[in-house]
């Protein structure tokens, strides 16, 4: 997978990998905000995709909203909520 275009019901995609504490923090924020606004989200584990690792490995977690890069390293709940409004 090389693009961030989500299925119709998923507006937020978070690229991360296991063992990444910033990813765990991002998943928690994204889950909370998406639940509050009724938006779907999913996590994409990049460790098995060399292209994604090369592109995003130093920036994870990387958050996309509606197919466009929104944040990396940390997710600001207010900024994410505004992007989903």
Named regions from a protein language model:
Residues 3-32:
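Local sequence-structure signature of Cys/Sec-based thiol-disulfide redox active-site neighborhoods
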Residues 24-27, 53, 77:
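Conserved strand-to-helix beginnings and helix N-cap segments that scaffold or border functional pockets
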Residues 39-50:
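Thiol-based oxidoreductase modules, predominantly thioredoxin-like and allied folds used
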Residues 48-62:
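Short Fe-S-cluster ligation motifs
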Residues 61-69:
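A short, hydrophobic beta-strand/beta-hairpin element that forms part of a small beta-sheet core
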Residues 80-85:
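Thiol-/selenol-based redox modules, centered on thioredoxin-like
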């Amino acid at each position: 997978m090389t693009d961030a275009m989500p299925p119709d019901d998923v507006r937020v995609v978070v690229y991360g990998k296991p063992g990444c504490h910033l990813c765990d923090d991002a998943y928690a924020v994204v889950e909370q905000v998406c639940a509050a606004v009724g938006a779907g989200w999913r996590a994409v584990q990049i460790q098995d995709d060399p292209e994604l690792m090369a592109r995003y490995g130093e920036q994870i977690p990387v958050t996309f909203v509606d197919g466009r890069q929104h944040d990396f390293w940390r997710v600001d709940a207010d900024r994410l909520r505004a992007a989903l409004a």
